[in-house]
Amino acid sequence: MPKQKISIGTWITIPNEQITEIIAKSPYDWIVIDLEHSTMSLDQAENLIRIIDANKKKSYVRITSDSTDQIKRMLDAGASGIIAPMIETFQQGKAIMDACFYPCLLYTSPSPRDL
């Protein structure tokens, strides 16, 4: 049986790049950017994701709602994963999970040549 490793991380609610860099240089394995309980914008969160990624740490984002746009934007920015709050039904959970993956080839956006 492989030896299990304990994973340790922390949460960020302050959109400060210098503080994030200090935390990202610490021995944490992962950092959660908390959009639900902060006034942080998506642009600020994207900057923090880049800082965390540059320090070779995992970044997770707790989004404010089950917004597909927020999920896709944070994953496109490089987040390692999403934490979704207040999931109360199977359908909500499935919609969030589906938003985390690219749609199948049958549902792609039209390319410019198709227009």
Question: Where is each model-derived feature located?
Answer:
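N-terminal amphipathic alpha-helix/helix-capping segment at the start of soluble metabolic enzymes
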Residues: 1-9
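Hydrophobic faces of well-ordered beta-strands that scaffold small-molecule active sites
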Residues: 8-10, 31-33, 59-61, 82-84
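Glycine-rich beta-to-alpha transition loops that act as phosphate-gripper elements at the mouths
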Residues: 12-15, 62-68, 86-87
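Glycine-rich, positively charged N-terminal anion/phosphate-binding segment
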Residues: 15-26, 39-54
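Alpha/beta enzyme core
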Residues: 15-30, 88-90, 95-98
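Active-site-adjacent beta->alpha loops and helix N-cap segments on the catalytic face
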Residues: 38-51, 67-69, 88-103
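Catalytic cores of alpha/beta
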Residues: 69-80
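Single conserved hydrophobic/aromatic residue that forms the stacking wall/gate
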Residues: 107-115
